[in-house]
A protein has these predicted regions:
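Surface-exposed flexible segments
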Residues: 36-46, 80-100, 146-148, 234-249, ...
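Residues within well-ordered beta-strands of beta-sheet-rich folds
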Residues: 25-27, 71-73, 242
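Beta-propeller and closely related beta-pinwheel folds
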Residues: 2-13, 43-215, 249-258
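Beta-sheet repeat architectures centered on beta-propellers
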Residues: 1, 11, 16-21, 120, ...
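Hydrophobic or amphipathic alpha-helical targeting/insertion segments
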Residues: 22-49
Length: 329
């Protein structure tokens, strides 16, 4: 009845952000929400707040910028822009080329829409070498820029291979890797199920409820693709399964590792010489003043070195260094 409490569990989708670059602008989408832009080229950019992108959809599951043609693409978005009640989990909308604000298809622009047919919702999408990979909960599609009059082509290339969580995928040197609800897959121009001797260990011990917390990270120093996930009984990431694609090629057999390395976010070595990652711990409180934050902290690591990027002098901060971790096996 109204006004009475309920003891039933409620599962909410996490408030994940999607970030991408559009020239000097950062575009940022809150999961199932609106999209913002922040311009780094203006005077005093760090003193300027991000603003909503005018004319853009106001409720979307995912977004990215196409790699060569500069269209802003929204996935699982509104069929009528500005009306959140029209959000369709299988609907795709893309802007006019070189525009963040024009989404109305006309005979003189390249804006457009597409609805995918296989699956019940789009889970995630990533840029590849020459394509965009799109996963639903049951299939994979390839999206390619083809120019006028269609702008993009959409090809259904796999079934019964959906993505388990929106960040559980990546591409390495033209090969897409991802974790599904029923195993691991790769796409190299054709779909392949990946033989995995530790598959039972992973999926029998997986908490699939917080599936959007699963994240995939590349460690190119060792030729490893890592999936960080929540084990049974845990609501935070506390396990990892790793596929070593370099050793698998050299030894001509699939090489997998498992472990308890917990990373809630991951960035491979590029700007920095080593990979960087974060993990969440409930055993500590934040050392900075955040009202109401008594449930734990997120700790930031530079893998392999133990360097505190905030204060190399060693003053205690909310960002803690790690010990030398060695190989990720």
């Amino acid at each position: 009845a109204w006004g009475e409490s309920s003891s039933d569990d409620v599962t909410l989708e996490p408030g994940l952000w999607v970030l991408d670059n559009y020239g000097t602008k950062l575009v940022a989408l809150i999961y199932n929400g609106s999209c913002f832009e922040w311009d780094s080229s203006i005077a005093n950019p760090t003193g300027t707040r991000a603003t909503l992108i005018s004319g853009a959809p106001t409720s979307s599951r995912h977004m990215l910028v196409s790699p060569t043609d500069r269209h802003l693409i929204f996935f699982g978005t509104e069929t009528t822009i500005g009306d959140t009640t029209t959000q369709d989990d299988m609907f795709i909308r893309f802007s006019d080329q070189e525009s963040l604000n024009d989404y109305t298809p006309t005979s003189t622009n390249t804006a457009g829409t597409q609805r995918l047919a296989q699956g019940s919702r789009i889970i995630g999408a990533i840029r590849g070498r020459d394509t965009i990979y799109i996963w639903t909960d049951s299939a994979i599609f390839i999206m390619r820029f083809v120019g006028q009059p269609f702008t993009f082509s959409f090809e259904h290339v796999g079934t019964n291979c959906g993505l388990i969580g929106k960040n559980a995928c990546m591409e390495v040197d033209g090969t897409a890797f991802w974790m599904s609800e029923n195993g691991f897959f790769q796409y190299t121009g054709h779909l392949q199920s990946m033989p995995c001797l530790v598959e039972d260990h992973v999926f029998d011990g997986l908490n699939s409820t917080p599936r959007d917390l699963i994240n995939c990270g590349l460690n190119n120093l060792f030729g490893e693709v890592n999936w960080f996930y929540c084990s049974s009984g845990s609501n935070v990431v506390d396990r990892v399964v790793t596929y070593n694609y370099l050793e698998s090629v050299m030894l001509k057999k699939p090489i997998w590792y498992t472990g308890t390395l917990a990373r809630t976010a991951w960035a491979d070595s590029s700007i920095f010489e080593k990979p960087h990652g974060c993990y969440y711990t409930t055993s500590d409180n934040s050392s900075y003043d955040v009202v109401g934050n008594t449930d734990g902290i997120t700790i930031y690591y530079e893998q392999e070195t133990g360097t505190d990027q905030v204060d190399a002098g060693g003053t205690v901060t909310a960002i803690t260094a790690n010990v030398l971790s060695g190989d990720f096996d």
